[in-house]
UniProtKB/Swiss-Prot annotation:
Natural source organism: Alkalilimnicola ehrlichii (strain ATCC BAA-1101 / DSM 17681 / MLHE-1)
Record's catalysed reaction(s): N(6)-carboxybiotinyl-L-lysyl-[protein] + acetyl-CoA = N(6)-biotinyl-L-lysyl-[protein] + malonyl-CoA
Name of protein: Acetyl-coenzyme A carboxylase carboxyl transferase subunit alpha
Phylogenetic placement of the source organism: Bacteria, Pseudomonadati, Pseudomonadota, Gammaproteobacteria, Chromatiales
Keywords linked to the UniProt accession: ATP-binding, Cytoplasm, Fatty acid biosynthesis, Fatty acid metabolism, Lipid biosynthesis, Lipid metabolism, Nucleotide-binding, Transferase
Subcellular locations according to the entry: Cytoplasm
Length: 318
């Protein structure tokens, strides 16, 4: 399996390459080298723990963008049953960068919505690299209204570089579509649980990110601008993206310290892409707990608490 090791993971990559080489040799040789393979595997595990215990904000941002990372459809397949995708905004078109539909979670009917990136080149282009156009956000709002009508809890999965800034998208009202979603989600009379699974890129993420709970995976990020974009503005050079990532405080744990997310769901060692099954189990348990807590509240309490959450953001304290 191609794990697509990042630059800071190269020492791990070298060890894994040696392990793979020994496995091939072991099939052909009469000598038993299983002990050597086990020793290298243990060494790789210790090295991985050491590297991942000291990640910078920029390295975490790179992990959030990892091409092997599970996307919305992977989480839908792993966490929900009987998913039926719904298409179109009933105004202009369908947008494959946003996927959504009805499903069951622990047997309970729910609505699921998320950003979807592509794996190969053709799929990336079709999904517009996970950058929704206005019709994507309007489709999401249509599904949320449907969920409210039928009293279905809403789960959203956020993973986008941002809303698509193309001319056509702007002509069709990109900012209006995002703003309308923010206003509508603040008042929807059904529980909403949002999870940042990778990149939480500015308004493009917020447009499906207003809810009663905001969860973030351990190696996800959330920011008003990309580190490269911030560095280009402040220092006129995208090469200072690492400095920008640190200064903006974009990581899940830093945002939790600031009270901007409700829970950090820890990822398996090496990231969600290294062990998707373990990631699904951890996230399923967290989503189940949060949904049970929210369904125990009255609609009036739900809306009042959601309003207070929104009003608490951005407060300055000495």
């Amino acid at each position: 399996m191609n794990l697509n090791f990042l630059d800071f993971e190269q020492p791990i990559a070298e060890l894994e390459a040696k392990i793979e080489e020994l496995r091939h040799v072991g099939h052909d040789a009469e000598v038993n080298i299983s002990e050597e393979i086990q020793r290298l595997q243990e060494k790789s595990h210790v090295l991985t723990e050491k590297i991942f215990a000291n990640l910078t904000a920029w390295q975490i941002a790179q992990l959030a963008r990892h091409p092997n990372r599970p996307y919305a459809l992977d989480y839908i397949d792993g966490l929900f049953e009987e998913f039926e995708e719904l298409h179109g905004d009933r105004t202009y078109a369908d947008d494959p960068a946003i996927v959504g539909g009805v499903a069951r979670f622990d047997g309970r009917p729910v609505m699921v919505i998320g950003h979807q990136k592509g794996r190969d080149t053709r799929e990336k282009v079709r999904r517009n690299f996970g950058m929704p156009r206005p019709e994507g956000y309007r489709k999401a709002l249509r599904l949320m209204r449907m969920a409210e009508r039928f009293q279905l809890p809403i789960f959203t999965f956020i993973d986008t570089p941002g809303a698509y800034p193309g001319v056509g998208a702007e002509e069709r009202g990109q900012s209006e579509a995002i703003a309308r979603n923010l206003a509508a989600m603040a008042r929807l009379r059904t529980p909403i649980i949002c999870t940042v699974t990778g990149e939480g890129g500015s308004g493009g993420a917020l447009a499906i990110g207003v809810g009663d709970r905001l969860l973030m995976l351990g190696y996800s990020v959330y920011s008003v601008i990309s580190p490269e974009g911030c560095a280009s503005i402040l220092w006129k050079s995208a090469e200072r993206a690492s400095d920008a990532a640190e200064a903006m405080g974009i990581t899940a744990h830093r945002l939790h310290e600031l009270g901007l997310n409700d829970r950090v769901v820890e990822e398996p060692l090496g990231g969600a892409h290294r062990n998707p099954e373990a990631m699904m189990e951890s996230l399923r348990a967290e989503l189940r707990e949060q949904l049970q807590a929210l369904e125990g509240q009255s609609t009036e309490t739900l809306l009042a608490d959601r309003y207070q959450r929104m009003m608490a953001f951005g407060q300055f304290r000495e």
